[in-house]
Swiss-Prot record:
One of its GO terms (cellular component) is extracellular space. The gene is Fgf23. This is Fibroblast growth factor 23. Belongs to the heparin-binding growth factors family. The modification Phosphoserine is found at S180. Gene3D superfamilies: 2.80.10.50. InterPro entries: Fibroblast_GF_fam, IL1/FGF. It comes from Mus musculus (Mouse). Keywords: Differentiation, Disulfide bond, Glycoprotein, Growth factor, Phosphoprotein, Secreted, Signal. Interacts with FGFR1. Interacts with FGFR2, FGFR3 and FGFR4. Affinity between fibroblast growth factors (FGFs) and their receptors is increased by KL and heparan sulfate glycosaminoglycans that function as coreceptors. Regulator of phosphate homeostasis. Inhibits renal tubular phosphate transport by reducing SLC34A1 levels. Acts directly on the parathyroid to decrease PTH secretion. Regulator of vitamin-D metabolism. Negatively regulates osteoblasts differentiation and matrix mineralization. Up-regulates EGR1 expression in the presence of KL. The keyword Disulfide bond applies. Its main location: secreted.
């Protein structure tokens, strides 16, 4: 009886600790609240190359030979035969402009971000924009699709199961350890972040106008300044010549 109670107590403590840990470290995955098993990758290929459609954080769409966190997509059905494609990592919707170029957008537009899905006889799927009449394609050639004609290159896709480990979808939010010079003054009271003034030598003229002998004083009896020069050299020593050197001025 005592052993059973101890085991129950240990089980309760472990449950409480696990809940506390989960609350202290929240799930930062972009897949939180979504169905992990529904992630797919749209694969397209030609006789030479193959790609997976991926949506980057800046909205750029291109192809990658291997599955990445940016090629993981969520395809959801809207109307009958219409689907919406969303990047699992970037939360951007796959959209198309009037020229047939595809891009990732944070804002959903039913006219530009909804596609009609058709399955061809070879088992591949094509995604047609009902407004612009272009197929979703990773190729450069863009032309309006007409039923019964061959689709353009890199426009036929296969939905592949996700093989990217779940751990790769977890991103650590970077912490800011530096400050900017534009921060308020109370954050930098010693003005460490502000740029210091640069010292540049500014030429200073060392020439002086000799006093006139008519003014009286020491210059009347020593017009050439011989006695005054001697007293200056005796008082200042070798530093007398350094007084005429230009000092750097901070500009």
């Amino acid at each position: 009886m005592l052993g059973t109670c101890l085991r129950l107590l240990v089980g309760v403590l472990c449950t409480v600790c696990s809940l506390g840990t989960a609350r202290a470290y929240p799930d930062t995955s972009p897949l939180l609240g979504s169905n992990w098993g529904s992630l797919t990758h749209l694969y397209t290929a030609t006789a030479r190359t193959s790609y997976h459609l991926q949506i980057h954080r800046d909205g750029h769409v291109d192809g990658t030979p291997h599955q990445t966190i940016y090629s993981a997509l969520m395809i959801t059905s809207e109307d009958a035969g219409s689907v919406v494609i969303t990047g699992a990592m970037t939360r951007r919707f796959l959209c198309m402009d009037l020229h047939g170029n595809i891009f990732g957008s944070l804002h959903f537009s039913p006219e530009n971000c909804k596609f009609r899905q058709w399955t061809l006889e070879n088992g591949y799927d094509v995604y047609l924009s009902q407004k612009h009449h272009y197929l979703v394609s990773l190729g450069r050639a863009k032309r309006i699709f007409q039923p019964g004609t061959n689709p353009p290159p890199f426009s036929q896709f296969l939905a592949r199961r996700n093989e990217v480990p779940l751990l790769h979808f977890y991103t650590v939010r970077p912490r800011r350890h530096t400050r900017s010079a534009e921060d308020p003054p109370e954050r930098d009271p010693l003005n460490v972040l502000k740029p210091r003034p640069r010292a540049t030598p500014v030429p200073v003229s060392c020439s002086r106008e000799l006093p006139s002998a008519e003014e009286g004083g020491p210059a009347a009896s020593d017009p050439l300044g011989v006695l005054r020069r001697g007293r200056g050299d005796a008082r200042g020593g070798a530093g007398g010549a350094d007084r005429c050197r230009p000092f750097p001025r901070f500009v």
